[in-house]
A protein has these predicted regions:
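Basic, helix-initiating cap at the start of DNA-binding domains
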Residues: 1-28, 37
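Alpha-helical structural segments
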Residues: 12, 20-23, 27, 41, ...
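Helix-turn-helix
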Residues: 16, 28-58, 62
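Alpha-helical DNA-contacting segments of helix-turn-helix folds
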Residues: 53, 60-74, 104, 108-111, ...
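Amphipathic alpha-helical packing segments from all-alpha helical-bundle domains
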Residues: 69, 118-158
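Amphipathic alpha-helical segments that line or abut small-molecule/effector binding pockets
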Residues: 84-103, 158, 182, 186, ...
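Amphipathic alpha-helical segments used for helix-helix packing
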Residues: 89-124, 134-138, 162, 166-174
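C-terminal peripheral helix-coil segments that are non-catalytic and often amphipathic
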Residues: 139-142, 170-198
């Protein structure tokens, strides 16, 4: 994680360093990234970099945690919008994330490039979705699904996030239109609902 010195930087300087890092991590895998290119783009002295981060892996993890924070905020907002009902979450999350990504397309493309360049990396290092799911489970209103035991609830949430992610990726990979992908997501959610509520 960044040092206190990094957090004491003026926000524009911090953001410039992070944008330089994001751009570089989107260009090459973490192992191939050049700290020199990052510090040149950020216009900071090389010695300063090591006052902010232990190494480029430390910086890489911090960049990914920022994406985690965006994802978690979107999930929590969607959960609140759907009355904390888990079976309403996929469509609410789909709509919110789709709108956000359309408004922030350039940043989303950089994020997707970071994931593609680091495909061989442990998935747990890329995004903290399992931890986010556990936080969501604590906030969900399980009314009507009280009969599900803890493992079943976890499996249900995993399924719901999987189908939502698949629906979003179908749109961004241009396999389906946003309308068709949403329709299929609603259908899948309906099938899961019938199984979960029985």
């Amino acid at each position: 994680m960044p040092t206190a010195t990094f957090f004491n930087l003026p926000p524009p300087k911090r953001e410039k360093l992070l944008q330089a890092a994001i751009t570089e991590f989107a260009r090459k895998s973490c192992g191939e990234v050049s700290i020199n290119r990052i510090i040149q783009a950020a216009e900071i002295p090389r010695g300063s970099f090591y006052q902010y981060f232990a190494d480029k892996t430390d910086l890489f993890r911090y960049v990914l945690r920022r994406y985690d924070a965006l994802l978690e905020a979107a999930i929590m907002k969607s959960l609140d919008q759907c009355g904390r009902r888990p079976l309403e979450l996929p469509l609410a999350l789909y709509d919110l994330v789709l709108a956000y990504i359309r408004e922030n397309w350039a940043q989303f493309e950089l994020f997707m490039s970071i994931l593609q360049k680091n495909m061989g990396m442990d998935a747990g290092q890329l995004l903290s979705l399992p931890e986010i799911i556990l936080k969501v489970m604590d906030r969900v209103d399980w009314q009507g699904l009280e009969h599900l035991v803890e493992d079943e609830r976890l499996a249900l949430m995993d399924l719901l996030f999987s189908i939502t992610g698949h629906a979003l990726m179908s749109v961004f990979c241009k396999k389906l239109s946003a309308v068709e992908s949403r329709r299929r997501l609603a259908l899948k959610t309906s099938i899961i609902r019938r199984g979960a509520e029985s």
